[in-house]
Swiss-Prot record:
Keywords: Ribonucleoprotein, Ribosomal protein, RNA-binding, rRNA-binding, tRNA-binding. NCBIfam families: rplP_bact. The lineage of its organism: Bacteria, Pseudomonadati, Pseudomonadota, Alphaproteobacteria, Rhodospirillales. InterPro entries: Ribosomal_uL16, Ribosomal_uL16_bact-type, Ribosomal_uL16_CS, Ribosomal_uL16_dom, Ribosomal_uL16_sf. Binds 23S rRNA and is also seen to make contacts with the A and possibly P site tRNAs. It holds the Pfam family Ribosomal_L16. PROSITE patterns: RIBOSOMAL_L16_1, RIBOSOMAL_L16_2. Belongs to the universal ribosomal protein uL16 family. The gene is rplP. GO terms for molecular function: rRNA binding; structural constituent of ribosome; tRNA binding. This is Large ribosomal subunit protein uL16. The keyword Transmembrane helix does not apply.
Length: 138
C-alpha cells in the first residue's frame, strides 16, 4: 500500500476540504480518467482496492496512473481507552481529495473496458465519481 517514506511531522490535524481542487483536474497521462465529485479523505487501502479492481478488469493491458497519494496520517486511540492522555498513534494514511480531482488515469485500452473498469474501481471508493475522456467529458 502507498505511504510516505518519511514525513516532517508524525501526526497531523484533521483539517477540512474546502472548495474545489486547485490542480490535478485535467488528464495529463492517459486517454480516460476517473474524476472525484465529492470532498473526502481516501485511505491507502481504498486506493489499492480500486487499483486492483481496475487492473484486473483490464487484464493487465494498457497502463494505469494513480494521481493521488496518501500523505495525511490519521491517528486513533485503542478501544476502551479513557479520554485525554494525548493524541493516539498514527493508524493509517489518507489522501485529501477535493471535487474535480483526477483519481486514476488509463491508456492503451478500449473505451468500454476503461468505462467498466472505472465503474468497478468507483465501487471501492467512498465518493461519487465521473468517467472522463480526452475527447470530451461524457
Amino acid at each position: 500500500m502507498l505511504s510516505p517514506k518519511r514525513t516532517k511531522f508524525r501526526k497531523a490535524h484533521k483539517g477540512r476540504i474546502k472548495g474545489v481542487t486547485k490542480g490535478g483536474s485535467a488528464l495529463n497521462f492517459g486517454a480516460y480518467g476517473l474524476k472525484a465529485l465529492e470532498p473526502e479523505r481516501i485511505t491507502a487501502r481504498q486506493i489499492e482496492a480500486a487499483r486492483r479492481a481496475l487492473t484486473r478488469h483490464m487484464k493487465r493491458q494498457g497502463r494505469v496512473w494513480i494521481r493521488i497519494f496518501p500523505d495525511l496520517p490519521v491517528s486513533s486511540k485503542p478501544a476502551e481507552v479513557r479520554m485525554g492522555s494525548g493524541k493516539g498513534a498514527p493508524e493509517f494514511w489518507t489522501a485529501r481529495v477535493a471535487p474535480g480531482r483526477i483519481l486514476f488515469e488509463v491508456d492503451g485500452v478500449a473505451e468500454e473496458i476503461a468505462r467498466h473498469g472505472f465503474a468497478l474501481a468507483a465501487a471501492k471508493l467512498p465518493i461519487k465519481t465521473k468517467f472522463i475522456s480526452r475527447i470530451g467529458d461524457i
